[in-house]
Amino acid sequence: MIKTLKNLFKQDREKFAVPKSVQSVIPIKTIWEDGIFLVGKNKYAKTFKFEDINYAVASREDKEAMFLEYSELLNALDSGATTKITINNRRLNRRDFEQTILIPMAEDGLDKYREEYNRMLLDKATGANSIVQDKYVTISVCKKNIEEARNYFARIGADLIGHFNRLGSKCTELDATDRLRIFHDFYRTGEETAFSFDMVQTMRKGHDFKDFICPDTFEFEKDCFRIGDRYGRVIFLREYAAYIKDSMVAELCELNRNMMLSVDVIPVPTDEAVREVENRLLGVETNITNWQRKQNQNNNFSAVIPYDMEQQRKESKEFLDDLTTRDQRMMFSVLTMVHTADTKEELDSDTEALLTTARKHLCQFAVLKYQQMDGLNTALPFGVRRIDALRTLTTESLAVFIPFRVQEIYHENGVYYGQNVISKNMIIANRRYLLNGNSFILGVSGAGKSFTAKEEMTNIILTDPNADVIIIDPEREYSPLVKAMQGEVIHISATSENHINAMDMNSDYGDGANPVILKSEFILSLCEQLIGGASLGAKQKSIIDRCTAGVYRYYQQGNYMGTPPTLQDFREELLKQSEPEAQEIALAIELFTDGSLNTFAKHTNVDTHSRLICYDILDLGKQLQPIGMLVVLDSILNRITQNRAKGRNTFIFIDEIYLLFQHEYSANFLFTLWKRVRKYGAYCTGITQNVDDLLQSHTARTMLANSEFIIMLNQASTDRIELAKLLNISDLQMSYITNVGAGQGLLKVGSSLVPFVNKFPKNTELYKLMTTKFGEV
């Protein structure tokens, strides 16, 4: 027998003792706060949790890269330890889930919309899979004492985290409480919220940690067991097919039940493995030689070597070749599964479904007979292996049981964006958790862009009293929703009675520095636009800067209280200057200060402090549009800086954002805003159907590439090609944004791309407020 395996069997050998209590079934002897458990004589185990990655929707090339990287991870496993890779299917606790996603009532006149939204969320939650998959790696090793074990796990943990990072997954260590919670949730399904464990208090009171996780009863029968009122069964993979698809593990875990699938891996040192295979090959060659000698003695000189002997020789040579030239390692492994159900009939039906799934892949599962307790302790991530149905595999063969499928997006206090097409689970994302929360919503006309944006706005207004929403609306699409949500619609045009003072400014405008310096930059840009887009000379810039400081002097001295100056005051300040250039500037801007286009030269007469503001710029003429865009963006910056001082978040939605990129100054201002707002607690969203046009602007291309959150709905063919290049989208992923219905597409969250579908019930008030379909508005 191979030395490594012999040593391992020796270490795992334990005296069998009939369990006297429920607690004694659990094979943990001692726990430490950092998550290391003693699970045998000098055998220590530690568990790491790793996140799923988008394997199922990746391109063939990406899948190959992930497969090879996962093979590297398996190759890097230490020979002296046993590694257990576990997939834990657990059902979300309904009550806990509802508390997390449902919007509490606020008695502010909007509760009827909250009730509607909650009904929609509950419908989606009921139709969803409601199964969450957690994935763990448990390393168990024999060491003399806890200090040696701790040093070992620190080194191994760093390696594991590095390998998972390269796969695009995040790996974290679990402490004692986190590990105990896994077992508690399995043993006590339905009581997930009741788990509470404090190591210090438990030690002080002399309680046993097993009391916090064990079920009320354990009953082990010939081919199943009972945990409390539930039934369970452990099965193991007995027969392996010659060829197994990489989707087998994912298909086995698709069953909508509480279950755990574990693969125990025992790597063998390459020198031992080569020696073992060479000995086997030598044995095969000896058998062939003996057979040939016997045939020769019988004068049968042309006899062909029997097929089975030839196969043994061929397979042994291939195995040896794998070990010596293809960087494969010999691994011993056993695959076990435990699944639970409410009734025995349901359990039998689930077992048959799992056996059928395995048969589809030409593999054969078998139920463990009279070994259910050992099987249960093997399948759960304790770090023990009590089932000896080991199979010899190479790294490549073992990597087929790849534990990755699809990434789930479920953030705390997030916004509902639809359902994951693959797992059918709800997508709840919180842009605050990303490196920058800026976003784009892209899609052809009719794909559901406005609806998606309105749904997000509605969610923010109804759920977060500490957040404000500002909309730039060039198509007058958002007014009904804004009015229904008690917001303010500001109509901006040359003839409108609504006015925004271009010179408005608060004390927080300067980001800690003198606000006038930053405002002076804005006035310079504004004057360049007012003069006709011509570049200002050095003299003109100096005059404008001097006049800006002069016109704000009294407002600054009054600590930014009272009435701010207007563009009319600014022009009067220009006229006071002696330089002829000042008179020229004053004359050039007269149309916009005292003439017919003076809407931005008057004091602000609208409520810019409402929680929900919509700037309606549909009637902004060609002459006023560049200036109007600048003034609106500056007004938004004013609000963002005010909110920052109050500790409030600001969400900005800009529909038809490509309009802003048609004017150099508004494009540059927007680019600066995009980069700066993250530190102000603000999040910008650009909405457009013209992706190709948008990407003609280098500024827009940079903004799109740097946005961490992108909602891609149905795309035109040219736009798809551009997006695929920019965001590295595979052909398979592209199919989710090709000729799909409204509200379907791809969601980019950080580095993840998740296919989603979002259907909102039509028989609701909210739907009527959000739809832009002709005949439904």
Q: How would you label these PLM feature ranges?
A:
Residues T452:
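Hydrophobic positions on the alpha1 helix immediately C-terminal to the Walker A/P-loop
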